[in-house]
Design a protein with these regions (language model features):
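PLP-dependent aminotransferase-class I/II
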Residues: 117-120, 139-176
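Arginine residue identity/basic-tract feature
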Residues: 30, 45-47, 54, 131, ...
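Glycine- and acidic
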Residues: 77-85, 107-114, 140-142, 167-173
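Conserved beta-loop-alpha segment that forms the PLP phosphate-binding cup at the N-terminus of a helix
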Residues: 94, 98-99, 110-139, 155-159
Length: 176
């Protein structure tokens, strides 16, 4: 079937969710092909298809065949790119791509930066850098963030994670 002919979202019925909720912790393992089949038929088919041409909503980053292959390779090799000693070539590629991106936007030749898993982690990383550049352990409790009422929810969550409490987050109303 063509993707255009498929629904954008396939919703699960309550009885299908109830079936999952009734599953008990198994006492022994099951054959992999049985588990994969169950996942394909009873879990993965009920979803919003971000690759669908009529999908216009939350943007989780739809998978392409190339990104899928990249995920498989990354999982298979379990590379931790947290430092040049653990994965020197992956770390080198990351640094070179950061240089390419920096050059495209007119930044310095030796930028700092890291790749992260998505927008929420990017927000936490940026908020942490801003906090650490501005506050010390002594005055952390004074840190206050100003965000608009249109700011993505991951920013307020990130602020809480890095120690800026709700009472120190100021939401500014927007009018246009």
């Amino acid at each position: 079937h063509e993707i255009h002919d498929q629904p954008v979202v396939v919703e699960a019925k309550e009885h299908q969710e109830d079936k999952i909720k009734q599953i008990k912790i198994p006492e022994k393992g099951r054959p992999v092909n049985e588990v994969v089949s169950e996942m394909m038929n009873e879990v993965y088919r009920y979803r919003g298809d971000a690759n669908h041409p009529r999908f216009f909503s939350f943007v989780p980053g739809p998978a392409s065949s190339v990104s899928w292959l990249g995920d498989i390779m990354t999982s298979a090799y379990n590379i931790h790119a947290g430092g040049s000693k653990l994965a020197p070539m992956v770390n080198c590629i990351e640094q070179e791509v950061l240089k390419w991106l920096a050059k495209q936007v007119g930044f310095t030749e030796n930028p700092g930066g890291v790749f992260v898993s998505g927008g929420s982690m990017a927000n936490i990383t940026a908020l942490t850098a801003a906090r650490d550049n501005t506050l010390t352990d002594i005055n952390l409790h004074l840190g206050t963030a100003y965000i608009s009422d249109q700011t993505h929810s991951s920013v307020a969550k990130g602020l809480r994670i890095i120690g800026i409490t709700d009472s120190r987050i100021r939401r500014i109303p927007t009018n246009s």
